[in-house]
Amino acid sequence: MTLILGSASPRRRELLAQLGVTPDAILPPDIDEEPRRGELPRPYCARLAAEKAAAVAAGPEDVVLCADTTVALGRRILGKPADAGEAARFLVALGGRRHEVITAVAVRRGDRLWQREVVSQVKMKRLSDLELNAYLASGEWEGKAGGYAIQGLASAFIPWISGSFTGIVGLPLAETATLLAAAGVPLYRAAA
């Protein structure tokens, strides 16, 4: 059995290591991540994780692990900002409000698919112009759903969360461990 991580995210690799799991291969899938018309955040996130898992080429006994993280402000999906201007708009919209961070995990082995979605609540403070401009200049927003990374500089902007911290980062470990175990992946092994 080979474990394939369908993600280029170094954060997901780091989180997997906390379970004593090292992927044998890293094969990020290339799928269309555009939301469908009228699609709500949670079904959107679950669909992307499943589509990513289906898109990774794997043998019948290989295990594919994929995830998708989405930031939702009400019914609005805030994906990865295209540029600093969009990141600024996201951060201003999130400021002073609670929002949801949804991470969907999909594990595939052969024709079997195991899935979970984890929804966490996050409150971001209103950012001053200095904070906003410094954060944008850091570049940390690039490639991050909602335009921020809670485990980085943006941690200073988050006074409150409810839910899974690792889910907000991008891979909810409790749920991921359950799914990997269901697929037969041994957990909690020390690195060789």
Curated annotation (Swiss-Prot):
It is found in: Cytoplasm. Its cofactor is a divalent metal cation. The record marks R11, T69, Q151 as: Important for substrate specificity. InterPro entries: ITPase-like_fam, Maf-like. It catalyses: dTTP + H2O = dTMP + diphosphate + H(+); UTP + H2O = UMP + diphosphate + H(+). Transmembrane segments: none annotated. Keywords: Cytoplasm, Hydrolase, Nucleotide metabolism. One of its GO terms (cellular component) is cytoplasm. The active site is at D68. Its EC number is 3.6.1.9. GO terms for molecular function: dTTP diphosphatase activity; UTP diphosphatase activity. GO terms for biological process: nucleotide metabolic process. It comes from the Bacteria. Nucleoside triphosphate pyrophosphatase that hydrolyzes dTTP and UTP. May have a dual role in cell division arrest and in preventing the incorporation of modified nucleotides into cellular nucleic acids. Belongs to the Maf family. YhdE subfamily. PANTHER family: BIFUNCTIONAL DTTP/UTP PYROPHOSPHATASE/METHYLTRANSFERASE PROTEIN-RELATED (PTHR43213), BIFUNCTIONAL DTTP_UTP PYROPHOSPHATASE_METHYLTRANSFERASE PROTEIN-RELATED (PTHR43213:SF5). This is dTTP/UTP pyrophosphatase. It comes from Cereibacter sphaeroides (strain ATCC 17023 / DSM 158 / JCM 6121 / CCUG 31486 / LMG 2827 / NBRC 12203 / NCIMB 8253 / ATH 2.4.1.).
